[in-house]
Amino acid sequence: MRMQSNPKADLLLDVRDLETHFYGEESVTRALGGVNFHVKSGEMLGIVGESGCGKSVTALSILRLLPKQTAKTVGGEVIFKGRNLLELSERQMREVRGNRIAMIFQDPMTSLSPVHTVGRQIAEAVQIHGRVSRAEALEKALEMLRLVRIADPERRLNNYPHEMSGGMRQRAMIAMALACSPELLIADEPTTALDVTIQAQILRLIVDLKDRMGTAVMFITHDLGVVAETCQRVIVMYAGRIVEQASVTDLFARPTHPYTRALMNSVPDRRRGRQSRLPEIPGVVPSLREPLVGCSFAERCPFAIGVCREKMPVLSEIQPGHAAACWRSNEVVNL
């Protein structure tokens, strides 16, 4: 089921029934099983869930960056500004990547080339998508380093990635991603490898730049606290499917899917006291190598009944803008 959106809203990205498979020698992993969501211009959308739930695969499917030998998007549409990205030629897609849609990856050390200076790498991104000279591109790179608040940007322009701290490298990645003023920025766990203080700085930087440049952000994370602080809407994913989506305010006020409630309960809370044991979600995520029968969360769910193991629930609206894929959502939401 696709949630109804405001027809007057400025829809930037519309993902419809997206399905992606990974192929092994003797098996097929159904990594995404019909994902539907949209991103509006200028908004910050959070995508949360445990590792392996399909968050990063969704992003890579949108940008068609999956390894062609082992993965394929087998169904659905990715409509960006009225065009289906899955139908574009590779040349047309290169004009979109890094230009109209940019992505920040988890580990900047492996995303940046170790044999080129940071300035050259940012300048190259500018030259690929704009008709500018090398000198103009380097000037733009310097401007971007200033924008992301890197100290002594003139010197850092000529640094190699290994000469910079983790926080500086991530700032450089943000500078590169935003150098061509994209309409959509996909940030895939951009603070995972950083310490807590630097994480907060990078998050604040992304939000500030979003507001300043008017860029929409699709923020992938496992941290609900980050979502609460930075996003307007949130999608909760589990086993390659969306199990709940709502505004951040509604989700935290009325978590409706049992998995969402379990995620929230597993977050440390000072009100529980030091001696209380942190709740955990029992069991494991089901294998996606076999077709799922029933709800994918049923074996881990304290609310599961017979129908949950027999029939897959569809994403249904609980109230305008808030939907969950749960047979017992009307009961769970009132607990």
Curated annotation (Swiss-Prot):
Any single GO BP term: peptide transport
Keyword annotations of the record: Amino-acid transport, ATP-binding, Cell inner membrane, Cell membrane, Membrane, Nucleotide-binding, Plasmid, Transport
Keyword ATP-binding: yes
Compartment(s) of residence: Cell inner membrane
GO terms of molecular function: ATP binding; ATP hydrolysis activity
Topology relative to the membrane: Peripheral membrane protein
Gene Ontology cellular-component terms listed: plasma membrane
Keyword Cell inner membrane: yes
ABC transporter domain residues: 15-264
Binding site for ATP: G49, E50, S51, G52, C53, G54, K55, S56
InterPro entries: AAA+_ATPase, ABC_Ni/Peptide_Import, ABC_transporter-like_ATP-bd, ABC_transporter-like_CS, Oligopep_ABC_C, P-loop_NTPase
Family to which the UniProt record says this protein belongs: Belongs to the ABC transporter superfamily.
Role of this protein: Probably part of a binding-protein-dependent transport system y4tOPQRS for a peptide. Probably responsible for energy coupling to the transport system.
Protein's name according to its UniProt entry: Probable peptide ABC transporter ATP-binding protein y4tR
Protein's organism: Sinorhizobium fredii (strain NBRC 101917 / NGR234)
Taxon lineage: Bacteria, Pseudomonadati, Pseudomonadota, Alphaproteobacteria, Hyphomicrobiales
